[in-house]
């Protein structure tokens, strides 16, 4: 919210781990980063474990990290205005994605599809995880907001379709250990 951004510090539920300062003690007690995730949803999964373990995430609004997910090129001004208006009219940020051209990496598509399944298996005792990245609440919304746009916007559609399928299969085959808060311990 605007009020939150005007404050110098605000507690939040989730952050990216790039440029974050993490307590080594908290990191160890929560089980460290899950290296199997490798790239996508590492932040969501770790932040959820941090909060469930009683720690808080503090955002300092005086600092900004400008980070992009892939190479993004704006479309014509007319197309930008159209898709941004559709997004605003329907109150759905996913439509705004069509206002720019994105170079879709099949490798990132693979990990995103694999990891959304894996992370939700691992954290299923504590509710859904990772869908907030894609402005949706569950797997069906993820299909509409991530999978389909990734394929439609891909330069190499065959590679992205294969990456999507392989990610789903590997995520479904994954068997992560269920994470649980260590009972009786209050860390923070």
Where are these regions (language model features)?
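Short, contiguous clusters of charged residues that form electrostatic/catalytic patches at enzyme active sites
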Residues: 25, 45, 114, 118
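Active-site-adjacent helix/loop segment of glycosyltransferases
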Residues: 56-160
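A short, conserved alpha-helix in the catalytic core of glycosyltransferases
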Residues: 20, 26-31, 36-69
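A recurrent flexible, glycine/aromatic-enriched loop bordering the glycosyltransferase active site
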Residues: 3-22, 100-104
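Short, conserved alpha-helical segments within structured domains
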Residues: 42-43, 135-140, 184
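Membrane-interface aromatic/basic loop that binds lipid-linked glycans or pyrophosphate carriers
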Residues: 150-188
């Amino acid at each position: 919210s605007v009020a939150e951004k005007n404050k110098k510090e605000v507690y939040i539920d989730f952050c990216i781990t790039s440029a974050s300062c993490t307590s080594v003690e908290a990191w160890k007690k929560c089980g460290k980063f899950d290296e199997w995730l490798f790239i996508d949803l590492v932040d969501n999964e770790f932040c959820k474990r941090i909060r469930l373990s009683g720690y808080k995430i503090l955002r300092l609004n005086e600092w900004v990290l400008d980070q992009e997910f892939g190479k993004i090129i704006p479309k014509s001004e007319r197309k930008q205005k159209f898709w941004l208006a559709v997004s605003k009219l329907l109150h759905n940020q996913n439509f705004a994605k069509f206002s720019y051209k994105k170079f879709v990496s099949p490798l990132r598509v693979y990990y995103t599809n694999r990891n959304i399944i894996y992370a939700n298996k691992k954290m299923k005792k504590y509710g859904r995880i990772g869908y907030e990245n894609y402005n949706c609440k569950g797997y069906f919304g993820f299909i509409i907001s991530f999978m389909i746009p990734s394929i439609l916007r891909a330069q190499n559609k065959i590679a992205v379709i294969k990456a999507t399928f392989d990610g789903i299969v590997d995520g479904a085959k994954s068997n992560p250990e269920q994470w649980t808060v260590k009972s009786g311990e209050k860390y923070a």
